[in-house]
Amino acid sequence: MTQQPLRGVTSLHFNQDQSCFCCAMETGVRIYNVEPLMEKGHLDHEQVGSVGLVEMLHRSNLLALVGGGSSPKFSEISVLIWDDAREGKDSKDKLVLEFTFTKPVLAVRMRHDKIVIVLRNRIYVYSFPDNPRKLFEFDTRDNPKGLCDLCPSLEKQLLVFPGHKCGSLQLVSKEKLVELRRGTDPATLYCINFSHDSSFLCASSDKGTVHIFALKDTRLNRRSALARVGKVGPMIGQYVDSQWSLASFTVPAESACICAFGRNTSKNVNSVIAICVDGTFHKYVFTPDGNCNREAFDVYLDICDDDDF
């Protein structure tokens, strides 16, 4: 998720198992552990300049970097793979791969076998990390936020991105599976994430609201009351066929945020983490019946560690 700089934050993103999150900043990069919340490391401005996007491969030494902000060292049309384990004092010694395009890169998603690179109207998928080759590419609706997520499970080839209806999501493997809707009023989607076992999906909007959907048991999701009515027209029928979130919450500051799933506190209680561009950290718990409450709050930008990444 990218955002106009607030306290120096240009974008935020969780790693694949959602145990860490990356913070791209005017001053470089910060990496945080989620539970417990602490800074794991950082790259300073001298090393990487101001950064527009950063993606971390699990908890490894590999980062995907895209330049941005007011004083970038790297281009906004290139994805650079940074290997922090490589020896060398110069930043060029750490760069091991480069993917270059003709238009700005808006998002990058990685897992152990693939890298997904998102432009405004197109998505590219490559094998990764050894000898990358393009697997496929496809057009999307206008996607100025670069919203996209790749299921971290190697057994499931799932990709999710904005649907053609405003406020909807397209969930695909080789073909469309289901359409999910966050609400009736238009809103900009900022982040989408799968749960660890792909049973749930969460999505956040520019209104600071996070919606949680059930994927494994879709009967938990709410549906339009019109679904109980008989035959309806084609436009209403498309609306009726959609599924609505089983639970939702809004962060108090109503600030744009990214969201992901935290550790489960019990069999029937799940948790969602919301990280906001204003520097705040929120943890909510929810149950299958839709109850949702905040459990923890902190300010991650006030947490500093002098260790490099």
UniProtKB/Swiss-Prot annotation:
<dbReference type="GO" id="GO:0034497">
    <property type="term" value="P:protein localization to phagophore assembly site"/>
</dbReference>
<dbReference type="InterPro" id="IPR001680">
    <property type="entry name" value="WD40_rpt"/>
</dbReference>
<dbReference type="GO" id="GO:0044804">
    <property type="term" value="P:nucleophagy"/>
</dbReference>
<dbReference type="Pfam" id="PF00400">
    <property type="entry name" value="WD40"/>
</dbReference>
<feature type="repeat" description="WD 1">
    <location>
        <begin position="4"/>
        <end position="42"/>
    </location>
</feature>
<dbReference type="GO" id="GO:0005829">
    <property type="term" value="C:cytosol"/>
</dbReference>
<comment type="function">
    <text>Component of the autophagy machinery that controls the major intracellular degradation process by which cytoplasmic materials are packaged into autophagosomes and delivered to lysosomes for degradation. Binds phosphatidylinositol 3-phosphate (PtdIns3P). Activated by the STK11/AMPK signaling pathway upon starvation, WDR45 is involved in autophagosome assembly downstream of WIPI2, regulating the size of forming autophagosomes.</text>
</comment>
<dbReference type="GO" id="GO:0032266">
    <property type="term" value="F:phosphatidylinositol-3-phosphate binding"/>
</dbReference>
<dbReference type="InterPro" id="IPR015943">
    <property type="entry name" value="WD40/YVTN_repeat-like_dom_sf"/>
</dbReference>
<feature type="short sequence motif" description="L/FRRG motif">
    <location>
        <begin position="180"/>
        <end position="183"/>
    </location>
</feature>
<dbReference type="GO" id="GO:0034045">
    <property type="term" value="C:phagophore assembly site membrane"/>
</dbReference>
<feature type="repeat" description="WD 2">
    <location>
        <begin position="184"/>
        <end position="223"/>
    </location>
</feature>
<dbReference type="GO" id="GO:0009267">
    <property type="term" value="P:cellular response to starvation"/>
</dbReference>
<keyword id="KW-0677">Repeat</keyword>
<dbReference type="InterPro" id="IPR048720">
    <property type="entry name" value="PROPPIN"/>
</dbReference>
<keyword id="KW-0963">Cytoplasm</keyword>
<dbReference type="GO" id="GO:0061723">
    <property type="term" value="P:glycophagy"/>
</dbReference>
<dbReference type="InterPro" id="IPR036322">
    <property type="entry name" value="WD40_repeat_dom_sf"/>
</dbReference>
<keyword id="KW-0072">Autophagy</keyword>
<dbReference type="GO" id="GO:0019901">
    <property type="term" value="F:protein kinase binding"/>
</dbReference>
<dbReference type="GO" id="GO:1901981">
    <property type="term" value="F:phosphatidylinositol phosphate binding"/>
</dbReference>
<comment type="similarity">
    <text>Belongs to the WD repeat PROPPIN family.</text>
</comment>
<comment type="subunit">
    <text>Interacts with WIPI1. Interacts with WIPI2. Interacts with ATG2A and ATG2B. Interacts with ULK1. May interact with the PRKAA1, PRKAA2, PRKAB1 and PRKAG1 subunits of the AMPK kinase. May interact with NUDC.</text>
</comment>
<keyword id="KW-0853">WD repeat</keyword>
<dbReference type="GO" id="GO:0030674">
    <property type="term" value="F:protein-macromolecule adaptor activity"/>
</dbReference>
<dbReference type="GO" id="GO:0000425">
    <property type="term" value="P:pexophagy"/>
</dbReference>
<dbReference type="GO" id="GO:0006914">
    <property type="term" value="P:autophagy"/>
</dbReference>
<dbReference type="GO" id="GO:0080025">
    <property type="term" value="F:phosphatidylinositol-3,5-bisphosphate binding"/>
</dbReference>
<protein>
    <recommendedName>
        <fullName>WD repeat domain phosphoinositide-interacting protein 4</fullName>
    </recommendedName>
</protein>
<keyword id="KW-0446">Lipid-binding</keyword>
<dbReference type="GO" id="GO:0000422">
    <property type="term" value="P:autophagy of mitochondrion"/>
</dbReference>
<dbReference type="GO" id="GO:2000786">
    <property type="term" value="P:positive regulation of autophagosome assembly"/>
</dbReference>
<dbReference type="GO" id="GO:0000407">
    <property type="term" value="C:phagophore assembly site"/>
</dbReference>
<dbReference type="GO" id="GO:0000045">
    <property type="term" value="P:autophagosome assembly"/>
</dbReference>
